[in-house]
Amino acid sequence: MSAANMPAGFTDYKVADISLAAWGRRETIIAESEMPALMGLRRKYLAEQPLKGAKILGCIHMTIQTAVLIETLVALGAEVRWSSCNIFSTQDQAAASIAAAGIPVFAWKGETEEEYEWCLEQTILKDGQPWDANMILDDGGDLTELLHKKYPQVLDRVHGVTEETTTGVHRLLDMLAKGELKVPAINVNDSVTKSKNDNKYGCRHSLNDAIKRGTDHLLSGKQALVIGYGDVGKGSAQSLRQEGMIVKVSEVDPICAMQACMDGFELVSPFIDGINDGTEASIDKALLGKIDLIVTTTGNVNVCDANMLKALKKRAVVCNIGHFDNEIDTAFMRKNWAWEEVKPQVHKVHRTGAGSFDPQNDDYLILLAEGRLVNLGNATGHPSRIMDGSFANQVLAQIFLFEQKFADLPAEKKAERLTVEVLPKKLDEEVALEMVRGFGGVVTQLTKQQADYIGVTVEGPFKPHAYRY
């Protein structure tokens, strides 16, 4: 749909350039062909309209793949209002195509922090007043937190929240433990078809792409340090190894550390004997002085701290593929060092003091996406086939919570329903099956004898809840 086809009088949006809508529509059509699970759900549930009456507040990266998600939710009966969960991740053509379809969206690439907060507010507000929303779809937890702190009255009507990423799940669990969470939540992040696809295989595809687009560097033969070896770290380490880099890994969890060793990565610590006492003396300068690229992947704070940044090799590339920009101590970098913009989302950070700098100085770091998500800041994120699993899970989670009708329960029953849970394994398998069919794969069916032997049904689920894929 082009801007010319926008519903007459529709102004409930703010995007960078509405004239990009036709471009966004062309890319969305291609993405649909690469998202068999999501489009399969659209076809399967279209007649049933399971989200009829759902009013969804959405905050997730406003990409082409998200456009397919939004239009699937709408096709299944929902109304939505949307914003992006990151100031750099919006693809402006995608936002324009959604606005041109008459769907409220507030997102553009390169928002300021103030503009980001404004966009979150506009997601919640319609005509200046809180919209009568009854569902939340979030990525990172900013929208959920804003609703709890500033618009708690909206939550009286909300049936639940579906959360996309590790960081947001951590925030939900913290709120639940403190008794602050007002609605039930589905942890989409830990569905197997999300965590293994998006977190691992997606990062394997998109990290090296972003670094090469941002720097035009050859990565082969250079040394990389990946901070963290969860699913995101695993995919990131593989991504860099594919480029021929010499990859080292730093980890705090002995199990993940063991996996790194078993996968053939050298396990190191940026700190002498692995102990960070907060001083420069604890830094392994010999290690960091050889590192050409450092990537943070943890969802934790200051895992690349000021002392590490001081010790890195001259002209090293620094980037983050975790959700927030606090994994790298960019606050220290802004306060103490001079920033030179090379191009959007690429800065030379001169370690010669704050203020002015000598353009010929060679003691600098190359910081990508200002320490925010590098794969969406410097590239276009994960491919459609990867996001297919994540967003199919989001649709199923929205349907699941909407049908539970938490907001309509009597007060005495609500307390026991305030949980943060993953989707039932049967739904995870449903998403996986549609993805396999999209690859042209054929899944073998158990015989009744085989199913009985291992204690499952022929239709599944096929693994116990505790199984680790």
From Swiss-Prot:
Recorded GO CC terms: cytosol
Name recorded for this polypeptide: Adenosylhomocysteinase
Cofactor dependence: NAD(+)
Residues the entry annotates as binding substrate: T63, D139, E164, K194, D198
Catalytic activities: S-adenosyl-L-homocysteine + H2O = L-homocysteine + adenosine
An annotated GO BP: L-homocysteine biosynthetic process
Xref: CDD domains: SAHH
Family: Belongs to the adenosylhomocysteinase family.
